[in-house]
Amino acid sequence: MEKTMFKSLSEIKQSYLELLKKIDDPEVISNIKEYSAINKEIAKIREISEKFITYENILKDVEQAKIMLESKNEEEVEFAKMIIDENSLKLDELEEKLKILILPQDENDDKNIIVEIRGAAGGDEANIFAGDLFRMYSKFADELGFRLKILSTNSASAGGFSQIVFSIKGEKAYSKFKFESGVHRVQRVPVTESQGRIHTSTTTVTVMPEIDDSVEIEIKPSDLKIDVFRSSGAGGQSVNTTDSAVRITHLPTNIVVTSQDERSQIANRETALTILKSKLYDLEMQKKAEEESGYRKLAGHGDRSEKIRTYNYPQDRVTDHRISFSTSLKPIMEGKLTPIIDALLAEEQNQKIKESGF
């Protein structure tokens, strides 16, 4: 193991041991807020610390065995060789795991998310596919045991959505969905196509961390233009007799968000502000990504106009262009996204390893 990596792991382990002592302090136990905060910190570094402690213990056994090699007793020498051989393999395996665990973690991986899907090029077919993607993500979220809530919809007359915004809450939700941001292309014969021709349409997906109390987003009231209107369904039909829907325009960025699916104007306003905060935070992340490279761009913080995936229905194939990964389409559309997510995660880890220099 490289000295810089060993030093970094030693520092993490030391912090872990200090936190374990601290959490047993009666004063900390009596302070719920502090106790909870320390518990979270312990949880973040528990796995890497425990694995490094195991690594150190095995390393000591190997070093002691190397001393035994100088013994004149043949049995002791053979026993020492056996210990070295067995433990050297364990050390190599642990080192590879530690290399991944020590990599810089995305600060948003633990957060819940807000997802926006928009029909882009292709008219009705793009909107219909937006609906298909929403169904796919709903099934994936359900498979993971996550909770999904629709925040805002703009249903399309031919089916699907011209826009749909929804939240997903669950353990490390962002880490599971962050690779989905970008342009999704579909190739198939639309329902509206009478001559059986294959059309190509696109839908855009944006995955944003849901902002919690740990993130400060300053929004000045003077920067907001707030409009109220009647909620409407598909085709513009009014579904509410009062002006309960809310549209908020953030004047400095010209970001517009709407919410009309809640029962009251107050609830719609709160939902719209939640979406706006996530959009503003997402905008900051994109700016940072422009100054960086590698894994941040892979996770969709880079060029949002980039075509990331093609869904080819005639050939029953999905291809993720970022990693040249192809698989069967049907399971993916049923929410079985794990093969693609795992492949993207592996590539992210490879890029992090290259950038870290370990």
Swiss-Prot record:
Gene3D superfamilies according to UniProt: 3.30.160.20, 3.30.70.1660, 6.10.140.1950
GO CC, alphabetical: cytoplasm
Main location: cytoplasm
Function: Peptide chain release factor 1 directs the termination of translation in response to the peptide chain termination codons UAG and UAA.
UniProt-listed InterPro entries: PCRF, Pep_chain_release_fac_I, Pep_chain_release_fac_I_sf, Prokaryotic/Mito_RF, RF-1
Source organism of the structure: Mycoplasmopsis agalactiae (strain NCTC 10123 / CIP 59.7 / PG2) (Mycoplasma agalactiae)
Protein name: Peptide chain release factor 1
Modified residues (N5-methylglutamine): 237
Source lineage: Bacteria, Bacillati, Mycoplasmatota, Mycoplasmoidales, Metamycoplasmataceae
Keywords, alphabetical: Cytoplasm, Methylation, Protein biosynthesis
Chain's gene name: prfA
Keyword Translocase listed: no
Keyword Repeat part of the UniProt annotation: no
Region Disordered, annotated ranges: 291-313
Compositional bias (Basic and acidic residues): 291-309
Database matches in SUPFAM superfamilies: Release factor
SMART domains in the cross-refs: PCRF (SM00937)
Record GO terms (molecular function): translation release factor activity, codon specific
Record's comment on post-translational modification: Methylated by PrmC. Methylation increases the termination efficiency of RF1.
Family: Belongs to the prokaryotic/mitochondrial release factor family.
Localization: Cytoplasm
